[in-house]
Every structure is written in structure tokens, then in C-alpha cells.
């Protein structure tokens, strides 16, 4: 796995679709591993990811995100989804906090689609 003609072809198709002929393309074995690697790569060491309280990274990945040193910052859910108004309120509260430099900074948002409830 990984060095066969099908994998090579898939890599080339992904590079072409992205317009990045020199890009490294890696295939991962599962969702938790993928979420962990992507989120860790996106975030600085002092940042966390905002997710609905029922989001997969918050409720079903057995601390995989926290294992990399990042915190999952949760907001309310509605049938598994977050509301833009709740996210905005969370971010405004963070930025208005006089001690924001001592708090985990929100650096990414995790959106479940479909949600843990099957909501689209």
C-alpha cells in the first residue's frame, strides 16, 4: 500500500486538481488520525479548535486532539450543529477578555457534516 500504481495515480490526480504538481500527498487510515494531523498542523501551540459540544473531535476521539497539546473549545449544539451567532459570541468574548493572552486562543473551527446526529 502506498507504492502501487493506483496510489501513484491518485496522488497525481489530487496534485492536478489542486494545481500543485510538486505537492506532497499522503493517505491516512482513518478519521481520527486525519483530524488529529490536520488540526495539529493548522494550529499554533497556544491555539485550540472550536467545535460544537457534540462534534466528533469534542466527543468521540478519545482525547486525540488534546494529545497534541491543543484544546477543544466547545460551544452549544443544535441537532449537532453550531450556530454562527454562538461562534461569533464566543470569539467576541475571547477578544474582549482583558486576559486573552492567558487563555487558549481559538485558531480553527471544526464543522461536523454530517453531524453526530446525522443532521446535514
Label every PLM stretch briefly.
Residues 1-31, 53-58, 64:
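Conserved N-terminal alpha-helix of the aminotransferase class I/II PLP-enzyme fold
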Residues 17, 37-46, 64:
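Glycine-rich loop at the start of a catalytic domain that most often binds anionic cofactors/ligands
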Residues 20-23, 44-47, 69-70, 104-107:
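Short coil/turn connectors at secondary-structure junctions
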Residues 24-43, 73-80:
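Conserved core of the PLP fold type I
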Residues 34, 57, 117:
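Glycine-rich nucleotide phosphate-binding loop and flanking beta-alpha elements
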Residues 40, 56, 62-64, 69-71:
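Domain-start "cap" segments at the beginnings of catalytic or binding domains
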Residues 41-59:
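Conserved PLP-anchoring active-site segment centered on the Schiff-base-forming lysine
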Residues 69-120:
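PLP-dependent aminotransferase-class I/II
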